[in-house]
Amino acid sequence: MPNIFSLICICLHSALHSSGFFFAKLPEAYAVFNPIVDVMPVIPLFFFLLAFVWQAAASFR
């Protein structure tokens, strides 16, 4: 159990300190796409929520 906890701590520590990866700047040629790139990580969550809505709608039939 302590090994799993230490592994989680190491992963969180590395994820928090590599924030330069998450906030990298796009090259000037692609600066127009900044708003789209900011929203892109949220798109899979919409599909995840859609699955629950679909199941709820199907169960009410």
Swiss-Prot record:
- One matching Pfam family, short form? PsbK
Q: Which InterPro entries match?
A: PSII_PsbK (IPR003687), PSII_PsbK_sf (IPR037270)
* The keyword Transcription belongs to this UniProt entry's keyword annotation: no
Where does the protein principally reside? plastid
Question: Which ranges does the record mark as transmembrane?
Answer: 36-56
The biological process GO terms on file are:
photosynthesis
As for membrane topology, the entry says: Single-pass membrane protein
| Subunit record text | PSII is composed of 1 copy each of membrane proteins PsbA, PsbB, PsbC, PsbD, PsbE, PsbF, PsbH, PsbI, PsbJ, PsbK, PsbL, PsbM, PsbT, PsbX, PsbY, PsbZ, Psb30/Ycf12, at least 3 peripheral proteins of the oxygen-evolving complex and a large number of cofactors. It forms dimeric complexes.
Family annotation (PANTHER family): PHOTOSYSTEM II REACTION CENTER PROTEIN K, PTHR35325
**Which family does the record claim for this protein?**
Belongs to the PsbK family.
Query: Which NCBIfam families does the protein's record reference?
Result: PRK02553.1
Fetch the HAMAP family from UniProt.
PSII_PsbK
Q: What is this protein called?
A: Photosystem II reaction center protein K
State the species of origin. Answer: Amborella trichopoda
* Organism classification: Eukaryota, Viridiplantae, Streptophyta, Embryophyta, Tracheophyta
Which gene produces this protein? psbK
